[in-house]
From Swiss-Prot:
Record Gene3D superfamilies: Glutamine Phosphoribosylpyrophosphate, subunit 1, domain 1 (3.60.20.10)
Pathway: Protein degradation; proteasomal Pup-dependent pathway
GO molecular function: threonine-type endopeptidase activity
Keywords of the record: Cytoplasm, Proteasome
Family: Belongs to the peptidase T1A family.
Domain of life, per lineage: Bacteria
Physiological role: Component of the proteasome core, a large protease complex with broad specificity involved in protein degradation.
The protein's name in its UniProt record: Proteasome subunit alpha
Organism: Rhodococcus opacus (strain B4)
High-level lineage: Bacteria, Bacillati, Actinomycetota, Actinomycetes, Mycobacteriales
HAMAP family from the UniProt entry: Proteasome_A_B
Amino acid sequence: MTMPYYASAEQIMRDRSELARKGIARGRSVVVLTFRDGVLFVAENPSTALHKVSELYDRLGFAAVGKYNEFENLRRAGIVHADMRGYSYDRRDVTGRSLANAYAQTLGTIFTEQPKPYEVEICVAEVGRVGSPKAPQLYRITYDGSIVDEQHFVVMGGTTEPIATAMRESYRADLDLEAAVGIAVNALRQGGAGEGEKRNVDVASLEVAVLDQSRPRRAFRRIAGAALEQLVPAAPAAASESAPEPKPDTETKPADPQD
């Protein structure tokens, strides 16, 4: 008689967590940060059709890493949730906290009840109305439904530690848009590079958008083309190109003739 296969609940949760983390680690990184006029999204995304950054509602934005089909389902569900709440009550009742809580409940349920968890990590950002003293809000929601109210910036994706370190060293309050883009792009260039080296992250591989608090209704807008080229700092020159060629210490002299 064969014994039935048994795995403890702890082992099952551990395996699901490992699966989700590996899937997220394969994704390219995203940086979300607050700046003087609202919230900035900067994502590594060479695709012009499949977006990792999107609008959710009037003052809400969305960013995600992981499996595209899974976070796209979450994005669409969030838009429907926000539209229904705004239609049933009032547009001002649609807040980042309520939407982040809805995402957390959905991901938590999927993680515990479904055979496979979602391999995603998402960020919901919110800015206040024009003239409101309310500070921008950033909510990070992970694959198991955990939710964290982040301060200043969020880093998601594969190689997060060097990017987060660069952000902590460079970030400061009251950044303007150009400075915020420069800090985020330079931080992304640290991901996956060796010690003291920077990757080449050019404009064509970036997806950039902002939640602009000064806009009267829909705060979300994308930045692309020439406008983005003016904001992105130049890529660092390769060491081989910048270093001068070494010169010989002594000049070679012809050998003396033999007698």
